[in-house]
């Protein structure tokens, strides 16, 4: 029998959880790209509205969710928690496998959680237009949807290889009145310089970020919006983990392992960060970030200051990085093709509180196809890395005959990614 836990609408979290307040260490500050000195909040105001800058640097533990954002969350939240009983039976594992399903959102992924928040704060700050990048299109779709909800224009630079691989997502963005172009593009000086050196450049998130920031800095009524990496983005995503804690309590379950795919860190962070205090208090719980072997920021990157974009326009962040000029192979998980990682996640990996594992594309698509046939949900290529990780953990439980509780975040559906399955 299918086991699922659905919370009531009035059980949507009323606050976002800020893990920085509970960590026994401070993160290294972002540095000014010109002076290489710690950047002040005021210096970020050219690209972000002040409420989001305040959330980026605050050490307050709980940040109230504004009522207009809660009203929009209620369209799709709380999202369900399922037990993957069919997958368990197939694997013949003593592990109990659960997955939180974020594909229930209006645009099919977890990205809407922060897109709505960022659109709201920009609207009340007087912003008229948002500019952003997107890889596979989940983030761009979410921001276009949220911009339409709060009356903002949205321009999206979509990584070229994903723009070509995933046409349905650009159509979805345009449905919500978004303006989407492939990156590198002819719309910016940086894009033109990239194309001049290589007209066949497949693009990267780093390049798309540079283009978005260049446009942002040219217009005082325009702000930049980022779908991952930064503290305030992970903050908004903690609604996932906060709901998950309640749902596991309903079942009387305590997780042994929590997994999520990892690109920049937003869905993984949103899932695991609310459980970090449990780990710090001595509870045995393992957190596993699942990333591509083709873009192994956490498993093979260096821990150092680096730019968040290719042109070197962003503040320098202390993070695991493959280098700002790294151009990942053309894998289908476009949302994971980022050279860096969230400073919060990076530091937790450095401190040994989070583990990271890399998977190749063949393994994750085998896991994704199996999951779709057994559980009835076609996962996004990105989310499939978490599925592969969960299957690996379930097999370990079988090998050692240990009934472990394995939980992962299924961050989005793959109905716009079906060509990847061919």
Swiss-Prot record:
Function: The beta subunit is responsible for the synthesis of L-tryptophan from indole and L-serine.
EC nos: 4.2.1.20
Catalysed transformations (reactions): (1S,2R)-1-C-(indol-3-yl)glycerol 3-phosphate + L-serine = D-glyceraldehyde 3-phosphate + L-tryptophan + H2O
One Pfam family linked to the record: PALP
Modified residues (N6-(pyridoxal phosphate)lysine): 111
Gene3D superfamilies tied to this protein: 3.40.50.1100
Subunit structure: Tetramer of two alpha and two beta chains.
CDD domains: Trp-synth_B (cd06446)
InterPro entries named in the record: Trp_synth_b-like, Trp_synth_b_CS, Trp_synth_beta, Trp_synth_beta/beta-like, TrpB-like_PALP, TrpB-like_PALP_sf
Cofactor(s), names only, from the UniProt record: pyridoxal 5'-phosphate
Annotated GO CC locations: cytoplasm
Keyword list, A-Z: Amino-acid biosynthesis, Aromatic amino acid biosynthesis, Lyase, Pyridoxal phosphate, Tryptophan biosynthesis
Pathway listed: Amino-acid biosynthesis; L-tryptophan biosynthesis; L-tryptophan from chorismate: step 5/5
Official protein name in the record: Tryptophan synthase beta chain
């Amino acid at each position: 029998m299918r086991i699922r836990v659905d919370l009531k609408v009035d059980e949507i979290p009323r606050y976002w959880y800020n893990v920085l307040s509970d960590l026994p260490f401070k993160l290294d500050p972002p540095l000014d790209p010109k002076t290489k000195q710690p950047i002040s909040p005021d210096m970020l105001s050219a690209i972000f509205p002040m409420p989001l800058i305040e959330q980026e640097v605050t050490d307050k533990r709980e940040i109230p969710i504004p009522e207009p954002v809660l009203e929009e969350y209620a369209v799709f939240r709380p999202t369900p928690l399922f037990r993957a009983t069919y997958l368990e039976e197939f694997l013949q594992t003593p592990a109990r496998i659960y997955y939180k399903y974020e594909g229930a959102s209006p645009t099919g992924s977890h990205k809407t959680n922060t897109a709505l928040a960022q659109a709201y704060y920009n609207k009340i700050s007087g912003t008229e237009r948002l500019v952003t990048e997107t890889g596979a299109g989940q983030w761009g779709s979410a921001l276009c949807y949220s911009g339409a909800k709060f009356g903002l224009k949205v321009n999206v630079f979509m990584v070229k290889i994903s723009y070509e691989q995933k046409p349905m997502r650009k159509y979805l963005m345009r449905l919500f009145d978004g303006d989407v172009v492939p990156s590198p593009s002819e719309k910016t000086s940086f894009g033109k310089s990239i194309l001049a050196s290589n007209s066949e450049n497949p693009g990267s998130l780093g390049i798309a970020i540079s283009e978005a920031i260049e446009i942002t800095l040219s217009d005082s009524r325009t702000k930049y919006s980022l779908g991952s990496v930064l503290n305030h983005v992970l903050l908004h995503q903690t609604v996932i983990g906060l709901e998950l804690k309640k749902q596991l309590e309903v079942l009387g379950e305590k997780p042994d392992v929590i997994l999520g795919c990892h690109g920049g860190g937003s869905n993984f962070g949103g899932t695991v960060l609310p459980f970090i205090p449990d780990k710090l208090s001595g509870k045995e719980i393992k957190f596993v970030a699942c990333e591509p072997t083709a873009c192994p920021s956490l498993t093979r990157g260096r821990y150092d200051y680096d730019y968040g974009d290719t042109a070197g326009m962003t503040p320098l962040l202390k993070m695991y990085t493959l280098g700002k000029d790294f151009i990942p192979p053309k894998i289908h998980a476009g949302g994971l093709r980022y050279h860096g990682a969230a400073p919060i996640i990076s530091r937790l990996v450095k401190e040994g509180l989070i583990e990271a594992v890399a998977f190749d594309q063949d393994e994750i698509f085998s896991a994704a196809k199996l999951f779709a046939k057994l559980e009835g949900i076609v996962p996004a290529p990105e989310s499939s890395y978490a599925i592969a990780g969960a299957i690996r953990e379930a097999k370990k439980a079988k090998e050692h005959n240990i009934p472990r509780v394995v939980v992962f975040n299924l961050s989005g559906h793959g109905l716009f990614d079906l060509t990847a399955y061919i």
